[in-house]
């Protein structure tokens, strides 16, 4: 089959937002208008097309990014619906990596919320162009201009309306297009009957004022337009659209639109904006990668004639077809039944069938082209972030980096039968979700699972029960602490065993220094003159790495340390790799005495929204939990408190907040960074863990 849509007419977009801003409903409406579904599903009825896991339908939130494809005005739009709950930021991150553009959905009553900030920051990191859709304009308290202001204040975004609403709350009846300077009035509930009219008299002045701001903002991003603007010349509609498109693609400008997905208003205009302002695969830079034959950097342009290269961004188990691998094709074409190279693992894989997904229904296709997003059946070794490419043109594309988990719980199977099934279930879930880890505690033998938050682990345990029929008892959540050194020190490790016959001999001197936060472990070999033979150097590094898994104070992983091997000695007969591995681990333990080791704990950025009367209580909550208030802002009758609080102190806070505010307060938290725990807390943790120090 020939290519159905040209690259110019392809859009790969994500829908991203804070939880409950109406993201899934917006996607539903897109699918309705583009003819993909005939009946609209409502999230609050648990019938939404994009939320296809049982837990999503029950909880009314989106957990996995469902990928679907739609058509609008002769364009193909591939949409990835991403979750807004902070525990699932990993899903957002991996989606952003393979998108060309995104629609950020805001709740017009709340404007920019904490999770909006998180996903916005991630999108900026990946240089993803965005348009902003101010949703829920029909809601009580909806305020379009407050939302625009919050984009400036909280995100420092150069965001400007390209349309403004007519009315708000139940009087929200239409939208003024600031580019055409026309009004779109909605006359029926399904949003299919739209009348284009002149701008109502009482809105004309406001529309002219906002159009002037828009023209000025766009002109600032383009020299030619700036000259015309300064000379007082008229900027045409075509020039304005072209200027907005270029500035949006360059991530210098963010068009803002208004609407209500639930009331079917503004969604078609938002789809038009996706076509007009978000990039096609041709508008973005060719993806970079490393040519595995030459080890040099290379690029893969969006071109069907180029060698095939794609990135696997999600693996999931489908109840009907088994293991599905979602991938984004950057260059070349791929036919079902062909072989590809998984360059990240150095393995050959056969593509069984290729499916194009629509939420949880699927259509089998023979071929995918550059710029497409599809799912493959039959890949055995491919995991998230792997590159799949042509056998004769190997390349490794930039992968996806995933955050480390911050919370862990012990799980134990309820029966012997569950024991065997649990191992398989956990392995499958970990394959699907790289931010979920499974480990066995060597000393206690219990299985420990770790993830990004309580909800994240709840959902995974729930899936284990439903999809794999495994019943398990779950322990209380534990914090994933870390340890590090705060002072530089030198230490010796000497391992000598002489017991008749062949002995053991390993001897090293290592200098340890603190590394920057997040940089991990760095090893440097500074041996001169072969005092430690080259073949034993990897064993020294391995010995240090192994013993860092089990820290010196309370057995938590040691992080962010530089180790420089600078001296040592060896024995011609008795030295071997094992001896040097043990010597290295002895050096690390010896260093701990003088390196000022500390325990680190995850700090959470917490945002608490409460009615004003309860502000005093909330301040008390933060300080009693070792937290610090970092700022406050009023919003309507509510106060929003931003604070930094240790995760260890936040367990069960939902209940405390509910009872303190009669159920009127809400809070959100997202992991921010690791910080030293106070001395008194450190002593308690060491005591509780039986201490290694």
UniProtKB/Swiss-Prot annotation:
> What Pfam families does the record tag this protein with?
EFG_C, EFG_III, EFG_IV, GTP_EFTU, GTP_EFTU_D2
* Alphabetized GO MF terms: GTP binding; GTPase activity; translation elongation factor activity
The tr-type G domain, residue ranges? 8-282
Looking at the record's lineage, which domain of life comes first? Answer: Bacteria
Instruction: Name the UniProt key words of this record, in alphabetical order.
Output: Cytoplasm, Elongation factor, GTP-binding, Nucleotide-binding, Protein biosynthesis
> InterPro entries annotated for this entry?
EFG_II, EFG_III, EFG_III/V, EFG_IV, EFG_V, EFG_V-like, EFTu-like_2, G_TR_CS
* Primary location recorded for the protein, binned into one broad class: cytoplasm
State which residue ranges cross the membrane: none
Q: Which GO terms describe its biological process?
A: ribosome disassembly
Q: Where in the cell is it found?
A: Cytoplasm
Q: Which family, according to the similarity comment?
A: Belongs to the TRAFAC class translation factor GTPase superfamily. Classic translation factor GTPase family. EF-G/EF-2 subfamily.
NCBIfam families, A to Z: EF-G (TIGR00484), PRK12740.1-3 (NF009379), PRK12740.1-5 (NF009381), small_GTP (TIGR00231)
Q: Give a short account of what the protein does.
A: Catalyzes the GTP-dependent ribosomal translocation step during translation elongation. During this step, the ribosome changes from the pre-translocational (PRE) to the post-translocational (POST) state as the newly formed A-site-bound peptidyl-tRNA and P-site-bound deacylated tRNA move to the P and E sites, respectively. Catalyzes the coordinated movement of the two tRNA molecules, the mRNA and conformational changes in the ribosome.
* Name listed for the protein in its UniProt record: Elongation factor G
| Organism expressing this protein natively | Enterococcus faecalis (strain ATCC 700802 / V583)
Q: What is the lineage of its organism?
A: Bacteria, Bacillati, Bacillota, Bacilli, Lactobacillales
């Amino acid at each position: 089959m020939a290519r159905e849509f040209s690259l110019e007419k392809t859009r790969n977009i994500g829908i991203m937002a804070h939880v409950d801003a109406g993201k899934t409903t917006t996607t539903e409406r897109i699918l309705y208008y583009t003819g993909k579904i005939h009946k609209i599903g409502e999230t609050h009825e648990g019938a939404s097309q994009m939320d296809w896991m049982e837990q999503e339908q029950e909880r009314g939130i989106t957990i996995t990014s469902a990928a679907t494809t739609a058509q609008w005005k002769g364009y193909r739009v591939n949409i990835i619906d991403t979750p807004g709950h902070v525990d699932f930021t990993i899903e957002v991150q991996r989606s952003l990596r393979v998108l060309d553009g995104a629609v950020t959905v805001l709740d017009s009553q709340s404007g920019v919320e904490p999770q909006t900030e998180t996903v916005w920051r991630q999108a900026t990191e990946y240089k993803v162009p965005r348009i902003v859709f101010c949703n829920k304009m029909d809601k009580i308290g909806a305020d379009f201009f407050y939302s625009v202001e919050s984009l400036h204040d909280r995100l420092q975004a150069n965001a400007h309306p390209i349309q403004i609403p007519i009315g708000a709350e139940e009087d929200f009846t239409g939208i003024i297009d600031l580019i055409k300077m026309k009004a779109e009035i909605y006359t029926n509930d399904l949003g299919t009957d739209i009348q284009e009219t002149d701008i109502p008299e009482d809105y004309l002045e406001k529309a002219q004022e906002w159009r002037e701001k828009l023209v000025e903002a766009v002109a600032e991003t383009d020299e030619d337009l700036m000259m015309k603007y300064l000379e007082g010349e008229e900027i045409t509609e075509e020039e304005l659209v072209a200027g907005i498109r270029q500035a949006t693609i360059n991530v210098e400008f963010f068009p803002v639109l208004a609407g209500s997905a639930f009331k079917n208003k503004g969604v078609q205009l938002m789809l038009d904006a996706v076509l007009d302002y978000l990039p096609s695969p041709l508008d973005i830079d060719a993806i970079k990668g490393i040519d595995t034959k030459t080890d040099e950097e290379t690029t893969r342009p969006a071109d069907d004639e180029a060698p095939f290269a794609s990135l696997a961004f999600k693996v999931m188990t489908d109840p009907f077809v088994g293991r599905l691998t979602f991938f984004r094709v950057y260059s070349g074409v791929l036919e079902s039944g062909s072989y590809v190279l998984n360059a990240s693992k150095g393995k050959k894989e056969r593509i069984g069938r290729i499916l194009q997904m629509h939420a949880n229904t699927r259509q089998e296709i023979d071929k995918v082209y550059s710029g497409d997003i599809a799912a493959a059946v039959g890949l055995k070794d491919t995991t998230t972030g792997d590159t799949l490419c042509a056998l004769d043109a190997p390349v490794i594309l930039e992968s996806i980096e995933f955050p480390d988990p911050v919370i862990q719980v012990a799980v134990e199977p309820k029966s012997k039968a569950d024991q065997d099934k649990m191992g398989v279930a956990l392995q499958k879930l970990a394959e699907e979700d790289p931010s979920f880890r499974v480990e066995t505690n060597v000393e206690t033998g219990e299985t420990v699972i770790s993830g990004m938050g309580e909800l994240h682990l709840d959902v995974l345990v729930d899936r284990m029960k439903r999809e794999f029929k495994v019943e398990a008892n779950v322990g209380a959540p534990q914090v994933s602490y870390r340890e590090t050194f705060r002072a530089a020190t030198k230490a010796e490790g000497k391992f000598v065993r002489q017991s008749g016959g062949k002995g053991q001999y390993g001897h090293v001197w290592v200098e340890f220094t603190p590394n920057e936060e997040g940089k991990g472990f760095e090893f440097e070999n500074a041996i001169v003159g072969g005092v430690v033979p080259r073949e034993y150097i990897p064993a020294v590094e391995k010995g240090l790495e192994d013993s860092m898994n089990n820290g010196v104070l309370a057995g938590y992983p040691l992080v962010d340390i530089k180790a420089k091997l600078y001296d040592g000695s060896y024995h011609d007969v008795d030295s071997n790799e094992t001896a040097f591995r043990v010597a290295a681990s002895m050096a690390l333990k010896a260093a701990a005495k003088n390196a000022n080791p500390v325990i680190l704990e995850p700090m959470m950025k917490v945002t608490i929204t409460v009615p004003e009367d309860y502000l005093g209580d909330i301040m008390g909550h933060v300080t009693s939990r070792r937290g610090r208030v970092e700022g406050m802002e009023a919003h309507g009758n509510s106060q929003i408190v931003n604070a930094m609080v240790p995760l260890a102190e936040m367990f069960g806070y939902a209940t405390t907040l509910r009872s303190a505010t009669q159920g009127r307060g809400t809070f959100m938290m997202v992991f921010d960074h690791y910080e030293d725990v106070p001395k008194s807390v450190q002593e308690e943790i060491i005591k509780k863990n039986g201490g290694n120090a």
